[in-house]
């Protein structure tokens, strides 16, 4: 968003809720708590009336789910960029977007509310814009990047910024390494 690439990052993850002693490889329909577990595919679909993202048990011994994670990246200019994700949050408490804070104002956007908010520090007015985004999207562009990669392999032109996709992937890998090692690590391109 700022045109700068992350050069290093540190990260932490937490796993306090999605833990348990259920058998490895357990699927929701095979669990005795299928109709009562708040995270089961049955409850999510039929009681909460939400889209089911899968039916693997969130509380199995082999689950890779984390409750949340945070990363702080540094850029060459010294700017700090923070990213947080939380998978325990439900319904309207969820957020996905970014907030940019500067010396003259700030701007933020949220994919879930489809809003962009702009605050100019010299004006008492806050401006909010609504936008539309295709329903059911992950917002990360993973599918589009994969299709563009295949298009380039076939000799075609990319429709998205593949370099930005590689920066994103390198940043994610650095964040994972930083969380595992408990230290700042370089973002390698």
Q: Which residues does each PLM region occupy?
A:
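C-terminal helical cap and adjacent loop that interface with cofactors, partners, or active-site loops
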Residues: 65-79, 87-189
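Contiguous beta-strand/loop segments that form the cofactor/metal-binding neighborhood of enzyme cores
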Residues: 1-113, 145-152
């Amino acid at each position: 968003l700022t045109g700068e690439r992350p050069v290093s990052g540190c990260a932490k993850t937490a796993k306090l809720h999605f833990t348990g002693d259920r058998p490895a490889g357990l699927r929701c329909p095979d669990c005795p708590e299928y109709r009562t577990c708040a995270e089961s595919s049955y409850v999510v679909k039929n009681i909460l009336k939400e889209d089911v993202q899968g039916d693997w048990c969130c509380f199995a011994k082999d689950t890779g789910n984390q409750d949340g994670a945070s990363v702080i990246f540094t850029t060459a200019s010294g700017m700090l960029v923070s990213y947080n994700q939380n998978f325990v949050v439900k319904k309207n408490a969820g957020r996905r977007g970014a907030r940019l804070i500067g010396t003259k104002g700030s701007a933020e956007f949220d994919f879930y509310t489809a809003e962009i908010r702009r605050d100019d520090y010299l004006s008492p007015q806050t401006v909010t814009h609504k936008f539309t985004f295709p329903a059911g999207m992950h917002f990360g562009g993973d599918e589009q990047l994969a299709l563009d990669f295949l298009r380039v392999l076939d000799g075609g032109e990319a429709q998205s910024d593949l370099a930005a996709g590689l920066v994103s992937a390198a940043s994610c890998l650095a964040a994972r390494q930083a969380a595992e090692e408990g230290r700042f690590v370089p973002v390698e391109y």
